[in-house]
Every structure is written in C-alpha cells, then in structure tokens.
Amino acid sequence: MLHYEVRKTAQYTADKPWLVLIHGLFGSLDNLNSIARALADEVNCVLVDLPNHGLSQTIESLDYLDINQGLVDMLAELGLTRAHFLGHSLGGKAAMYFALHNESACESLIVADIAPVSYPHRHQAVFAGLQNVDLATISSRRDALQQLSEHVKEPPTQQFLLKGLYQHEDTWQWRFSVDEIIASYPALIDWPRIEEQFRNPTLFIIGGESDYVTRDHQAAIRSLFPNVKAKVIHGTGHWLHAEKPAVFNKIVNDHIQKLSS
C-alpha cells in the first residue's frame, strides 16, 4: 500500500476537484506540499509517497505496474472515482502510466518535466554518494555531507538528498530505500511499449533550461496524449516547481479551474 496524506479545502464541498500529487526519485510527499498549500482554497489534494520512498512499502524490484496498482488501491480506499493527476520526474512517469491504463479515473494529467521515453543512466554519482555515506558511523549531517560530496558535487543535489536523512533514536536513516531503488532503477528509467492513448486533457510543464523534455520527445508525447498542451517556464531547470513556485502553481491552478468551470 502507498502512504498518502489528504489535504481537503478549508470550505470542503463535494464538487471541489481532487488532485493527486506524485513526487520524483529520492523524494517524498513533502516535496510537493507547497503546491497543495497554494491550491488549498480550491482543490482537494492527495500527496503520495512512492514505494521505496517516505513511509510507503519497500518493494525489491519496483516497476510502473506496482506503482499503478498502488494508486488504484489508494483511490478505492479514498472512495474517489476520478481525480486530476500531477507528477514530477519519476512521479510524472508514474502519473502517465496510470492515466494510460485508467483513463476513466484520471480527469486530467499534468506532467512536470519528464517524457514518456526511456532515459540513459544518469544517477551513477548519486548512487555512489549515497552508498558512501556510512550511516553506522556518522554523528551529524555534516559528516554525511562530507561523505556524500566525494561523489555528488552539486550543492543543490546534495541538499535535496540530505532532506531524506533523519535521526531515529541513536541511528541515522534515509527516508528512501537506497538498495531497492538502485535495483529498480533500470525499470524506472525505462518506458514500456504502450498501445493505449490517454484522450483526456493533458498538460506538460517544462523547465526552459532542462534537458529532460526536448523537441525530440514531441512525437512520443503526442502519440500517447493526443489532447496535449505544453507550457514552458523559462529560467528554470528540472526542479521547476521549486525554482519558480508561483508561476508553476498558477499554471496548475488555471488548468484545473478551467476544466472545473
């Protein structure tokens, strides 16, 4: 089962739209909490921990079929028949997979800076850095940073990963399952061959300085999502929702409100 948290609007009514928010690799549901806060007046939100992340279950060989089943079970548990879905990076691929296999349950799809394609291995340094952190001997976050930085050189990436480090009693732990993520990585950067199309409204939000979605991906996107539109947030990279949150959140809210009017 997936761990999730519900954020209902302050003036909750049954006609308010629902939005499921799915984070990226090495993240947790907290990563997209700022979006839920920004939409709190108009949109009910469900924040999800992916398997092997946060408080969700550990799965040794995770793939998109596993994530899809978790999302299906979560909607059933919540009593929701339809919702909008928003995913960033790995979460975007999970949201796309869900939409393509559960069109009637996905009112619309919002994909943040990822495409429905297979990607090359690009996290080797991150894996090496995480495995280099000796949780049994570190005594502070500074110790962890020193060990992590032997392989991970970019300060923003270092700080993002260290958000997943916490102290439980006398031991340090990650909020994600490093070994299981590494084992599942080939399946997660891959993209399966899918014949279905998702014909409901679809919005791709792309970082203007990011290389995760390029013109070369347009054909793959349109073949699966014929009812697609795209917005580019200039001056942002892959972490577009964190770099320009006000712009990102307005795009998301405008998309949902237009469909709800």
Language-model regions: role of each:
Residues 24-27, 89:
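Active-site glycine-rich loops that stabilize anionic/oxyanionic intermediates
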Residues 20-24, 206:
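The conserved beta1-alpha1 loop
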Residues 236-245, 249:
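Catalytic histidine-centered segment of alpha/beta-hydrolase-like enzymes
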